[in-house]
Amino acid sequence: MLFFMLLLFFGCATELKVDDTIEEGFVEKVEQTEEAEPTLGIAHSENCDQTAIGSDVCNMVLYDHNEEVWELYDYEGKVILLDFSTVWCGPCQAAGHYAQPLQDEYGDNFLFVTILVEGATGDPPTKEEVDEWVSVHNITTSPVLYGDRTLLDQTGEAGYRIGGFPTYVFIDKELKIHVGAVGYNDSYIRSVIEELL
């Protein structure tokens, strides 16, 4: 039991170094596409030049679990928690059960957003995997988005600086990156949400 609790707290390591928090200098720069017909996954992103903690977040446009376009900038005025997870990660699966309860508890001024970066094989998640994630975690109003590794970059210069899964990025009501953390810690997650609300 202790092993599983430690695994949930620390998260799944990738080939990247695991960071306790996302520090100053965390930046995002995602290639922009404008006229290409999007497929499931990343539709496009904009305003992504050197977005550091305290700066405006990049406007990600992804597909949600209903295969509808989901745009981050549509949620200005809400506290947003981005959860970067993978299907293959045990701690991500365990933490996934908190998404809908947190969404329900904090209500309309808060949005818990799961971005599935990889499926079970390390490739982008399939529709079946996303549907299963939604079903297993009893998600009804908390968005689950199709993502992939193009959102990530250990240096933080060309994507989110992710060192392990799950990684959480907190965005304030003005769409500024506030802080990030690796691994689910319920009291910490709640304290940051409450601070930003």
Task: Identify the residue ranges that each predicted region occupies.
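Sec-dependent signal peptide recognition
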Residues: 1-7
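C-terminal motif of bacterial Sec signal peptides marking the signal peptidase cleavage site
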Residues: 10-11
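N-terminal "domain-start" segment that seeds a small globular fold
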Residues: 16-19, 30-73, 141-144
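Short pre-active-site segment immediately N-terminal to redox-active cysteine/selenocysteine motifs
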Residues: 78-80, 84-88, 119, 164
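Conserved helix-turn-beta segment immediately C-terminal to the redox Cys motif
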Residues: 78-79, 94-117
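Conserved redox-active cysteine motifs that mediate thiol-disulfide chemistry
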Residues: 84-101, 122
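Short, internal strand/loop/helix patches
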Residues: 113, 129-167, 171-173
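Thiol-/selenol-based redox modules, centered on thioredoxin-like
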Residues: 163-197
